[in-house]
Amino acid sequence: MLVQFSAAIAAIGMLSSVALAQGVALTDPQIAHIAYTAGQLDIAGAKQAISRSKNKDVRAFAADMVSDHTAVNKQALDLVKKLNVTPKDNDTSRALTKQAADKRAELSKLKGAEFDKAYIANEVAYHTTVNGALETTLIPSATNPELKSLLQTGLKIFQGHQQHAEQVAAALK
């Protein structure tokens, strides 16, 4: 279960890296779409956790994910409007969306502590992968200084999410 999701979410890094290796650099509109999509997917997963979990720590973590990712995505939308740029859908965004939908369906079959552990384990894997992709691919590939700055700010927030998820995961063992 976790392996399937971890492999799927690695699409951020792998597909982005493949594009770069082939000399096809990601454009700022593609980067903006990937980043926004990743945030929306984490919000959807967090809302699922809020509705299904009874664990106060898991629910608090999920509420933070909704709040923080909503705020970062609002900043992203404000920036693309200011720059008059339309985020461009791409293979990475589509792969992430499909895999996240599959994972939410898988999680919907779990209950109680089993759900909590699986959700938090996914959050650890998700943020580890997203943070790696931000550091190694998305931030270096961004050409607009304001987009690059927003991605760097997001990375700091998401590194905190990763640490928080790791703490909750340890407490659930």
Region roles according to the model:
Residues 2-7, 12-173:
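His/Met- and acidic-residue-enriched segments that coordinate or traffic transition-metal cofactors
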